[in-house]
Amino acid sequence: MAPFRGRGGFRGGARGASMSRGRRGAARGGAKRGGFAAARTADQVEESNTQFRQAPESEHSQPESSDESASEAEDDEDSEDAQPASAIYATLLQSMSARKTPFGGTVVDPPHVSHRKKRKLHHHVPGPEEVPGAALMPEEGHAHPRGDDQGSETNGPASGGEDHEEEGEAEDLDEEEEQQRLDNTEDSPFDAHFANPDENELAVRLKRITDNQWITKKLDVGRGRGVLQVPAADEIALSRRKVRSTRDVVLKARLVDNAQKVLGNFDDTEQAIAPSIFDYQDLLFGARTVQNAGRLRDIICLHALNHILMTRDRVIKNNAKLAAATDDVDAEYRDQGFTRPKILFLLETKQACVRLLDSITKLHDFEQQENKKRFLESFSLPEDKFSDEKPADFRELFEGNDENEFRIGVKLTRKTLKLYSTFYNSDIILASALGLRRAIESGDPKKRDSDFLSSIEMVIMEQADATLMQNWEHAEFVFEHLNLQPKDPHDCDFSRVRSWYLDDQARHIRQTIVLSAYLTPKINTLYNKYMRNVAGRLKYTQDYTTGLIETLSYGIKQTFLRFDSPSHLTDPDARFKYFNTSILPSISRLPKTPEGGPGVLVFIPSYLDFVRVRNSLVDSDFSYASISEYTDTTDVRKARSHFMNGKHSLLLYTGRAHHFHRYNIRGVKRVVFYGVPENPRFYDEILGFVGKTVERGEVSRAEAGVRVCFSRWERLELERIVGSKRIVRMIADKGDVFDFV
């Protein structure tokens, strides 16, 4: 296997390879609150490929909990239904080529799969400790004991496919709520998209997705702009309904009051994206901020909860119909996937899990929350680590528990929220991309299991911009493993599996929601490759008409220098050549002042470029220091001190070092941006270093300056800084020098 790139091998972007903030032990006996209060812990993950403890196999075990089988009324006399699930699965695969699909052709159901009344059979459910290959996360290179904080975060066995019910749940649905449920969900987006899609229209849209044929509509909405695409032939498919509040959304009765209380009316931006969210379209939202993050989280959690409840209640209703049907009545209800998990949240930190579960419990009243204390002790720490001097986006991401290797299953019943459920018995999976990859790749390579992702119907990536600063390959790995055909049956009742699952079209039915503070080429690639939903997709970006530069008030000259770069692939070479031939010679000509050295900070967004520049300076006459995400605390302190005192003329500083630490560097008189930072806040903060030096009188405003090297391949990054009204001229103009003050 090729080595993992990024921060320290597998970890990718850990917060400083040798400078992790805190240890796992800090979480033990942590804050114990009545609610999902914010808190924080972190640990340094081993950067080697640590082997995970494997649970022993066993032929005899008890079900995970007694409530799993309580609602499974069975009749063991029905020998036809007593066929092993593995036999059904094998026969189904052999006959798959004959199934009737939206594109034509026929499929003959396996002869032993009856269309008559189905009775669920008791299935043996091994506990997590009996699961072959169940990977448990290590702590400091050692396997956790069975009762630790991550013991159940494993992809354990399925329990009779999608067994959604606890004992007596169906009876708990009183007549009034049952009627309201039926009224609310009739002709709902859930019904049209998942439960009963029009087969002819589905076939047309799948064909257009294959041919990459989308009709497009531009939307000027909120404080941004959107592009709506639908794989349909008729322009009417681009029409959108108005969603001004939660009252305009088809919700389960038990969510209505809390939704109105928590969310109420939507603002302009929320009204722009709400139709896409609640109508199951894909959404790429490139305008996430600290201010709107909480509302976005609540909206998405409401949608996810509603989806789970609709799915479960549909299964309950069909179970009742099957139980009441007589043997001479043909009844087929396709209302399930291969496995139970339906929602996947890709989060950046454990504290983000705490915030997300806080949203869920605000929107749904649970009588009981199992393993809540254990969860808070492992995932939560007080959010008061940093002072207000740190930027708000930094504090939102890293305050509390900033550990970024985790995964946990969440099971929802009508009255209970159960944390630490095994993946195959979970409705929701909360995980970081790294944690999920570790779970899939652990153990014997021949027994790696990602089947628990086979029936994911909604995936949400909450902070794609933060994921970029870790290791984007982990996110790509997860998306590559979504909605694949399962390798094992997992006690699935294939007579209940929806046709589009069997036809391997689930990836085009799945809804994908990606939130980010800004968009980058990698995020756009994810959009083009994995967000191909038959319902359509919306890309929403901020309005960058004026750009960040018009809001800056430092009064410092900023010069943007365009260099020739004929190809995106050769751009790193062209940039390095330009830096060596144009930028370094100009730095060497700077006058030396009695107050210290020239104080030039070179900001390098890419670590690979940083290594290349640093190596090129080894044999030069420049006195320089360097700070990257891998530099240990002692060397960072020494580099900052020597640069501030003028002992070093240059300070090389990486974008990820700034992302993870937001150092306040003194002695900066001039800045060279080796490339345009993807995060526009970084430009403001680095420029602020020079502004503070001017305020302290260490350099005059005329002597201070900023130079930015850019090529035509950095259009997105440049637009966020200079604005869309200037970007065309700066990219295409004959001149290559552009000054701003």
Swiss-Prot record:
<keyword id="KW-0539">Nucleus</keyword>
<dbReference type="InterPro" id="IPR010678">
    <property type="entry name" value="UTP25"/>
</dbReference>
<feature type="compositionally biased region" description="Acidic residues">
    <location>
        <begin position="65"/>
        <end position="81"/>
    </location>
</feature>
<dbReference type="Pfam" id="PF06862">
    <property type="entry name" value="Utp25_C"/>
</dbReference>
<feature type="compositionally biased region" description="Basic residues">
    <location>
        <begin position="113"/>
        <end position="125"/>
    </location>
</feature>
<dbReference type="GO" id="GO:0000462">
    <property type="term" value="P:maturation of SSU-rRNA from tricistronic rRNA transcript (SSU-rRNA, 5.8S rRNA, LSU-rRNA)"/>
</dbReference>
<dbReference type="GO" id="GO:0019843">
    <property type="term" value="F:rRNA binding"/>
</dbReference>
<feature type="compositionally biased region" description="Basic and acidic residues">
    <location>
        <begin position="139"/>
        <end position="149"/>
    </location>
</feature>
<comment type="similarity">
    <text>Belongs to the UTP25 family.</text>
</comment>
<feature type="region of interest" description="Disordered">
    <location>
        <begin position="1"/>
        <end position="197"/>
    </location>
</feature>
<dbReference type="GO" id="GO:0032040">
    <property type="term" value="C:small-subunit processome"/>
</dbReference>
<dbReference type="InterPro" id="IPR053940">
    <property type="entry name" value="UTP25_NTPase-like"/>
</dbReference>
<comment type="subunit">
    <text>Component of the ribosomal small subunit (SSU) processome composed of at least 40 protein subunits and snoRNA U3.</text>
</comment>
<dbReference type="Pfam" id="PF22916">
    <property type="entry name" value="UTP25_NTPase-like"/>
</dbReference>
<keyword id="KW-0698">rRNA processing</keyword>
<protein>
    <recommendedName>
        <fullName>U3 small nucleolar RNA-associated protein 25</fullName>
    </recommendedName>
</protein>
<keyword id="KW-0687">Ribonucleoprotein</keyword>
<comment type="function">
    <text>DEAD-box RNA helicase-like protein required for pre-18S rRNA processing, specifically at sites A0, A1, and A2.</text>
</comment>
<dbReference type="GO" id="GO:0034511">
    <property type="term" value="F:U3 snoRNA binding"/>
</dbReference>
<dbReference type="GO" id="GO:0005730">
    <property type="term" value="C:nucleolus"/>
</dbReference>
<dbReference type="InterPro" id="IPR053939">
    <property type="entry name" value="UTP25_C"/>
</dbReference>
<keyword id="KW-0690">Ribosome biogenesis</keyword>
<feature type="compositionally biased region" description="Acidic residues">
    <location>
        <begin position="163"/>
        <end position="178"/>
    </location>
</feature>
<feature type="compositionally biased region" description="Gly residues">
    <location>
        <begin position="1"/>
        <end position="15"/>
    </location>
</feature>
